[in-house]
Amino acid sequence: MEIALALKAVILGIVEGLTEFLPISSTGHLILAGQLLDFNDEKGKIFEIVIQFGAILAVCWEFRARIGNVVRGLRAEPLAQRFAANVVIASVPAIVLAFIFGKWIKAHLFNPISVALAFIVGGVVILLAEWRDARRGTVSHPQGNALLEAAKAGAPRIESVDDLNWRDALKVGLAQCFALVPGTSRSGATIIGGMLFGLSRQVATEFSFFLAIPVIFGATVYELYKARALLNGDDLGIFAVGFVFAFLSAFLCVRWLLRFVATHDFKPFAWYRIAFGIVVLLTAYSGLVSWHA
């Protein structure tokens, strides 16, 4: 295994793990990182699929107890059945639109300039959502008489993933459709969409994690099947390196984010998105970085 290639695998694995579940777009970062590292050929595309699989397995491991309880309760427990149904309902819209428009999106939007614009627009949307949240006087855990005041002010009406109904799940699923545009961020679309539809920040974040499992897992299996002719045993070493680093970095990131959202908003991510998008546009038009589609 070439050291330079292994280093690229490590970097891209970490980039995937750290960005997959933050509202900053893993796809956007991978497109840009792939351009900089000159690792965006057919092998690079397959590599991205593999490291995404590593990242989603980290979520499965973090929530293994909850997933196990849901699976065991599917036969007889209404709560588990409703939870599973909500995940399926929320997954359908994006899957359908991806099937219809997937080829067009890849042909026209998978380039650094489009990604940079999506970064900026997404950052502005997050700021507007947080501004709206603050203006409504939202509190995370109202108690006593504050409960009535919070309700009047428009506080989140859903404080637990188990309180979601199918309409809530469908709304979050529709929000997830915006993530088909590279640079938008799947987690950002589902979390901010969830908050706008009445979920607390913590519930929106947790449901976003669970929603990622069928969506990313299904996309991974489908893309690997399509690229099966390009799979080569000689690449297993590089794929394994990227997979491991994506898994580890994603696992740490998920744990950190769950703690972060308990006491912070998403404004730092919004400003990061805007700044990063502007930097990409400026370097592209000034010629400092040779971004190419």
Swiss-Prot record:
Pfam families: BacA (PF02673). GO terms for cellular component: plasma membrane. It catalyses: di-trans,octa-cis-undecaprenyl diphosphate + H2O = di-trans,octa-cis-undecaprenyl phosphate + phosphate + H(+). It is found in: Cell inner membrane. One of its GO terms (molecular function) is undecaprenyl-diphosphatase activity. It is an enzyme of class 3 (hydrolase). GO terms for biological process: cell wall organization; peptidoglycan biosynthetic process; regulation of cell shape; response to antibiotic. Its EC number is 3.6.1.27. Keywords: Antibiotic resistance, Cell inner membrane, Cell membrane, Cell shape, Cell wall biogenesis/degradation, Hydrolase, Membrane, Peptidoglycan synthesis, Transmembrane, Transmembrane helix. The chain crosses the membrane at residues 3-23, 43-63, 85-105, 109-129, 178-198, 203-223, 238-258, 269-289. It is a multi-pass membrane protein. Catalyzes the dephosphorylation of undecaprenyl diphosphate (UPP). Confers resistance to bacitracin. Belongs to the UppP family. Bacitracin is thought to be involved in the inhibition of peptidoglycan synthesis by sequestering undecaprenyl diphosphate, thereby reducing the pool of lipid carrier available. This is Undecaprenyl-diphosphatase. It comes from Cupriavidus necator (strain ATCC 17699 / DSM 428 / KCTC 22496 / NCIMB 10442 / H16 / Stanier 337). The gene is uppP.
